[in-house]
Amino acid sequence: MLVPRRARVVGWSTVLLNVVSVADSVWLCGAVLLGDAPVTAAQGFWRVDALSALLALCITGVTCVAAVCAPGMGGSDGYDARQVRRFRIFVNAFALMMLVAVTTSNVGIMWVAIEATTITSAVVIPLHRTRASVEASWKYLLICSVGIALAFAGTVLAYFDFVSTAGQVPNALNWTVLRAAAPSMHPELMRLAFAFILVGYGTKAGLAPMHTWLPDAHSEAPAPMSAMMSGVLLAVAMYAIVRWKGVVDLTAASFATNLLLAAGLLSLLVGSFSLVIQRRYKRMLAYSSVEHIGLVSIGLALGPLGMFAAFLHLVNHAVAKSMAFLLAGRILHRYDTTEIARVTGLLRAMPWTGSLFAAAVLALVGLPPFGLFVSEFLLVRAAVLTGRTWVAAVVLLCLLVAFVSLINHLNRMLYGAVPEGVKVGEARGWKIVTLAACAVVLVVLGLVLPRPVSALLDRTVSVLLP
């Protein structure tokens, strides 16, 4: 249905505010790079270092792109006024909670914020009000709530260990205080705490075998929400794991590294081989997210170079996957199906959308000149340099499987005859321009890694080293 003028004004106002948020995130990145200390406020309760600034930039950037492509932004998008209103309220709350999670120094507030992302996003998933979307929302809510409860148990264990060794200290739940006390904490208890934390936040991050909610939720949610969940929500959950790894590494040496490596390899195997049998393109993109979050987890276990590759991969994946899901939403609106077999002749029916969707998928399989090729190459190199050549071999095998599967599915969608009843042609509007800009970003990150980005990634790695 056509969107009222008032709704479009509100929509573009939201986009403008998101542009301001992106500018603020860029300022934070610059302040972290140019300053001698992290940006702090409220006596250290809010603390933005390089890692926080990097995630904040990803969150605001993806949210801004999603806002341009959101319901109520013009034309006939199939949403009524009530759906548009609910989407805007809860998506903005969702983005706010992600920002709170990565900018607070308090592990308790971070836990609350990540739990709040579950609630705010679960309301948006069934926006289409279909049986499948409602079921996916409940599945997501229940599984992730159990995971968050386990993360809470791990947080409580770590806090009790801290109190038993350091006593009652102001700001005891702040990262800086925990890291300072970590060498004197009990290794056995911290191992148990991190196991709970990894399973808990790993559920939210989509790490296998806790990933079972992800394909349903990402495939049933509206395209902008799918883009935000896959592009940055998984990264926020990994942020929590990485922060705790920085504490546990000072207490229990290589325990966290080994767990992350195991979880990453399992996720990579499950994600890549699941791509072979997919029949729906949104579920295909969802399982691709499991694969890529596995690569990030592996990189975090491969020393400084691996961590650099992992954070670069998070950035690349945020851009590529959000772009892919937003384009998938355009395809769904035109073809009225998510079945790969029923989407043919995409390049003829939607030349711009088809070309950009092809670029997004080629980026996700790690082909040059896109940025994911660089991060995956660095990850494999890190595995070899750390003496884990078998890890490099497994990664290359899984990347090959993912490449063949995704290219096969993509070819079936791009070519062939346009189905009867599908309109041919599309207008070039702001949405296409915005998505094309995402492709440009991926090419820039693949050809020439800008010096400020490289410096921010280096600073991010140094924040987490013992």
Locate predicted features.
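Membrane-entry segments of alpha-helical transmembrane domains in multi-pass membrane proteins
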Residues: 47-58, 100-112
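Hydrophobic alpha-helical membrane-insertion segments
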Residues: 16-26, 144-156, 360, 437-451
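Short phosphate-coordinating micro-motif centered on Lys-Gly-acidic
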Residues: 115
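Cytoplasmic/organellar membrane-interface segments at the starts of transmembrane helices
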Residues: 168-171, 221, 350-352, 403-466
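Hydrophobic transmembrane alpha-helices and their helix-loop junctions in integral membrane proteins
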Residues: 65-74, 96-108, 120-377, 381-412
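Alpha-helical transmembrane segments and their helix-start/interface "positive-inside/aromatic belt" motifs
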Residues: 7-18, 135-147, 350-354, 429-436
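Transmembrane helix-loop-helix hairpins at membrane boundaries of multipass inner-membrane proteins
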Residues: 1-89, 176, 457-463
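Alpha-helical transmembrane segments
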Residues: 14-24, 60, 92-96, 195-197, ...
